[in-house]
Curated annotation (Swiss-Prot):
Coiled coil: none annotated. This is Leucine--tRNA ligase. GO terms for cellular component: cytosol. NCBIfam families: leuS_bact (TIGR00396). Its main location: cytoplasm. It is an enzyme of class 6 (ligase). It comes from Streptococcus pyogenes serotype M4 (strain MGAS10750).
């Protein structure tokens, strides 16, 4: 049996593509464009795992398909290479993070090239390259000039073990850090913030303009979380102080019986009475040790302390005790709430715990038993009595505005973006702080502000980054003799990834971020493929920066990514015991088709789980490529199931894909190829071209491969294969298995040219219809012959053909024909005597 040798074929074609720059981005202005983007990887020390190529293969198939359809294709790759792991490694080993990063990139690139992806490597970007981050810094200076980058003293999520503050989005629900799982504490620090809130409405509205999964749009909507309501001002009794509360339900103001301030609220110390001072100070200290997520957990026990003061309810003059409680966040809304315990579960639990008044203002429910959180007509509400929710809200807002104690207000849960990190391995923030108290941005002519090379990259211990230790870089003097210090915080890893798709368009431009005409030509990105875990952060940040650049006239589109697709997760094979605990694969043995624990002998259940080092079920693509070939890996990952489904890795599935490719190889290299078309494969070939074309366009790669298999099965039943169909089939399979595609193309054409730009095959609509039908001929009710005849023959023609058939003539010889019944396209029934 003939098998193809992937170890010879694949490196040969990879070298051919590299030497000939086969995938250099097309620039023919008369052609349509297609920009296929992968989420670029962080080059970790572990290298690629088999999950990476799933998305990369999908965009590669699309890119190869679009090239063959006559598009200019931009399909680039680069490296999101700043970040904590490299710095952590450098601190652990004493090595330079830049060297570690360069080694990792070289390894990733080797692995990616071994998989046959058609990237234009002339456009490679690396976020740690000063020629790249010059423009990351330039964008920051523009944000600063527009007032969108500002410094603030804010309570941050401080991680002592990492020596840095992290964004809210990087804190896990259990209150630990996403990276490392370390404790997170709240600590006030001077930080750089980006005013993403200024774009909240546009970030919300423009989701309507993009073709993204609805689930991802919903995650962004929920993160931005727009609320319409009212601001209400409460005076503090016996003082000149007041505070503002934002509420979405101003209609329930008559039911507000107490107020709660965040422990960090600026008013707390000023209104706390001497009797309560110690308890309040103690509570504030405890709250500072908790993350926002831990504080707002609905299931946790309610805690709080009374300040000793009262606020006055503006609508009825009632006194409301003012408490502090950690479930109110200083960073959300105004950092103060009015509590309506009759109609809010959290307020109700708090009121019950601390014996506070509960006054119902909506009809329905028993508020002694539980909060009534549904809608009802208003009661105990003076001028709102008898009104429904919408009417009551409108009337209360009107009253608040007339009395000068409130106004209608739209708010968003979205917070400004905490942009500074107290780390070394990141882009320096291009700001200088002068001793006269002013700050200025580093002028564009002095960018990039290069990260200095230093051995001393441990956290400074002061809360500043290690750059505070590099004095010759840190200290500067102006022409007028005024001394200054450079900003020591660096940018987060999100910075470089918020605009990299723009740099691919013009990666070597030294004068500007990218040429306007090229940006006009290529934007927006046509398809962006990556994991759903980036749904909120990266995608929201990139959209924000893109909108700022749109306002600056740098980019021509409002949105960066027209279509987004999230590939599913490739799960590892794993095993569970009777308690449901996962067992590492090296502790499992297979006997008679069942799986057993090596040490205990217990029978185990096979169950897919996320690949992890601890379960020893991580599959390295290098091993797969070596054993089966890159084309097999590509075809297998696309054939596993729908691209957006999470599916378990299977060695059997891999073997099946390899066998299919061997059959393809044998079909083209051993079957007699003829210039004459017998017509036997007309229908299946044209069906295959039509189906594969449509399914690749819709990213239904698994069904496209299934159709290719249908063609191979049909072709194998024939003695010969029509040359045009052989070539067309090889073109169809080439985007999936590009090395094999090139090899078979040369076997058929000996052209010496790559298959990559050969025009995509078209199909003949008329051949999709069956022109012939099989009919049965019955004599005395028994089938005596089956005939293939032209479709839609008339009764008379059908009768003629049937009676002329040799088998039929033998049956009716010497007999009298009483009647012939012909049913077009079905049967002929002959009655004889």
């Amino acid at each position: 049996m003939t098998f193809y040798d992937h170890t010879a074929i694949e490196p040969k074609w990879q070298a051919f593509w590299a030497d000939n720059h086969t995938f250099k981005t097309g620039t023919d202005a008369s052609k349509p464009k297609f920009y296929a983007l992968d989420m670029f990887p962080y080059p970790s020390g572990a290298g690629l795992h088999v999950g990476h190529p799933e998305g990369y293969t999908a965009t590669d198939i699309l890119s190869r398909f679009k090239r063959a359809q006559g598009h200019n294709v931009l399909h680039p790759m680069g490296w999101d290479a700043f970040g904590l792991p490299a710095e952590q490694y450098a601190m652990d080993t004493g090595n330079d993070p830049a060297e570690f990063t360069a080694e990792n990139i070289a390894n990733f690139k080797r692995q990616i090239n071994a998989l046959g992806f058609s990237y234009d490597w002339d456009r490679e970007v690396n976020t740690t390259d000063p020629n790249y981050y010059k423009w990351t810094q330039w964008i920051f200076t523009k944000l600063y000039e527009k007032g969108l980058a500002y410094e603030a003293e804010v309570p941050v999520n401080w991680v002592e073990e990492l020596g840095t503050a992290i964004a809210n989005e990087e804190v896990l629900p259990d209150g630990t850090s996403e990276r490392g799982g370390y404790p997170v504490v709240r600590k006030p620090m001077r930080q750089w913030m980006l005013k993403i809130t200024a774009y909240a409405e546009r970030l919300l509205e423009d989701l309507e303009e993009v073709d993204w999964p609805e689930s991802i749009k919903d995650m962004q909507r929920n993160w931005i979380d727009k609320s319409t309501g009212a601001n209400v001002t409460f005076k503090v009794k016996d003082t000149d102080k007041d505070f503002t509360v934002f509420t979405t339900r101003p209609d329930t103001l008559f039911g507000a019986t107490y107020a709660v301030l965040a422990p960090e609220h600026a008013l707390v110390d000023a209104i706390t009475t001497a009797d309560q001072a110690e308890a309040v100070a103690d509570y504030k200290r405890q709250a500072s040790l908790k993350s926002d997520l831990a504080r707002t957990d609905l299931a946790k026990e309610k805690t709080g302390v009374w300040t000793g003061s009262y606020a006055i309810n503006p609508v009825n003059g009632n006194e409301m005790p003012v408490w502090i409680a950690d479930y109110v966040l200083a960073s959300y809304g105004t950092g103060a709430i009015m509590a309506v315990p009759a109609h809010d579960e959290r307020d109700w639990e708090f009121a019950k715990q601390f014996n506070l008044d509960i006054i119902p203002v909506l009809e329905g429910g028993n508020v002694e038993e539980a909060a009534f959180t549904e809608d009802g007509l208003h009661i105990n509400s003076d001028f709102l009595d008898g009104l429904d929710k919408a009417s009551a809200i409108a009337k209360m807002v009107e009253w608040l505005e007339a009395e000068g104690v409130g106004n209608e207000k739209v708010t968003y849960r979205l917070r400004d973006w905490l942009f500074s990190r107290q780390r070394y391995w990141g882009e320096p923030i291009p700001i200088i702080h002068w001793e006269d108290g002013t700050s200025t941005a580093v002028p564009e002519s002095e960018l990039p502000l290069v990260l200095p090379v230093t051995k001393d990259i441990r956290p400074s211990g002061t809360g500043e980054s290690p750059l505070a230790n590099v004095t010759d870089w840190l200290e500067v003097t102006r022409e007028d003799g005024v001394k200054g210090r450079r900003e020591t915080n660096t940018m987060p890893q999100w910075a470089g990834s918020s605009w990299y798709y723009l740099r691919y368009i013009d990666p070597h431009n030294t004068e500007k971020l990218a040429d306007e005409e090229l940006l006009k030509q290529w934007l927006p990105v046509d398809i962006y493929v990556g994991g759903a875990e980036h749904a909120v952060l990266h995608l929201l940040y990139a959209r924000f920066w893109h909108k700022v650049l749109y306002d600056l006239g740098v980019v021509p589109t409002k949105e960066p990514f027209q279509k987004l697709f999230n590939q599913g997760m490739i799960l590892g094979t794993s095993y569970r015991d009777s308690r449901g605990a996962l067992v590492a694969t090296d502790k499992v043995e297979k006997r008679d088709g069942s799986f057993f624990h090596v040490e205990t002998g217990e029978e185990l259940e096979q169950a897919p789980a996320k690949m992890s080092k601890s379960l020893k079920n991580v599959v390295n693509p290098d091993d797969v490529v070596e054993q089966y070939g890159a084309d097999t890996l590509r075809v297998y990952e696309m054939f596993m199931g729908p691209l957006d489904a999470s599916i378990a890795w299977s060695e059997e599935g891999l073997e099946g894909s390899r066998k299919f490719l061997d059959r393809v190889y044998r079909l083209i290299t051993t079957k007699e190829i003829t210039e004459e078309n017998s017509g036997a494969l007309d229908k299946v070939y044209n069906e295959t071209v039509k189906a594969v074309t449509e399914q690749v366009d819709q990213m239904k790669f698994n069904t496209a491969i299934a159709q290719l298999m249908v063609f191979v099965n049909a072709a194998n039943k024939e003695d010969k294969l029509f040359s045009d169909y052989a070539k067309g089939f090889v073109q169809l399979i080439a985007p999936f298995a590009p090395h094999l595609g090139e090899e078979l193309w040369q076997a058929l054409t000996a052209s010496g040219e790559s298959i990559s730009y050969v025009p995509w095959p078209s199909y003949d609509e008329s051949k999709l219809v069956e022109n012939d039908v099989e009919i049965v001929v019955q004599i005395k009710g028994k089938v005596k012959a089956k005939l293939v005849v032209a479709k839609d023959l008339s009764r008379e023609e059908l009768q003629e053909v049937a009676l002329a058939n040799e088998k039929v003539q033998a049956e009716i010889a010497g007999k009298d024909i009483i009647k012939v019944i012909a049913v077009p396209n079905k049967l002929v029934n002959i009655v004889i005597k």
